[in-house]
Amino acid sequence: MKYLIPFFLISTIVFSQDKVDPKDLEVWEPEPKIVEPYKLNGIPSDAIILFDGTDFSKWKSVNSDQEILWSLNKDKSMTVKPGTGAIHTIEEHGSIQLHIEWKTPVVISGDGQYRGNSGIFFQRRYEVQVLDSYENRTYSNGQAGAIYIEHIPLVNASLPPGKWQKYDIIFNAPKYDEKGVKIKNGSFIVFHNGVLIQNGVSILRPTVELDESIPNSLYLQDHG
């Protein structure tokens, strides 16, 4: 007991010296903007809709002079036409939150990386992998939800082929100072079908070697 009592007294003294009026910790400005929360099958009131199922008006083909040859479907989805080229948004982006839904073909062909392979590239540089990873083993840093080659997903939350799957992704772009020197890496938080699979992971290098210091577009891959 003679060792415990002095320790308690010291702790009490330190606490009393650090005591702060709770009101001094209150921050009133800036006040967060009010938005309408999303309802089931809804979207936040300030969201930018990149695809409404009717046209590709906010997208371009990577083959700059070519029209987009992907299919528009009756259920207001789009389908990649292999070999026609990737598409990207007309608008460039910095740090964003993205909700995207996707599914892989019901008819299974191939295995590993040859099953519904695609990717979502943020700023055309950093890839979140899209793949049929349901009972389909491949290298862990290349399965669905991987930050391609760099970060393995925490778990495999994949659904069977033909089922709609969801990614909710928070992308924080890397930061540069006025001299163009990187001062902070970019990062990803990824939820796959509501399950956290990437928890603030740091991006050490781009999937595609492009200038990281400038904004760029969102890119959907045609893997062929």
Q: Where does each model-flagged region fall?
A:
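Bacterial Sec-dependent N-terminal signal peptides
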Residues: 1-17
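Carbohydrate-interacting regions of secretory-pathway proteins
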Residues: 17-224
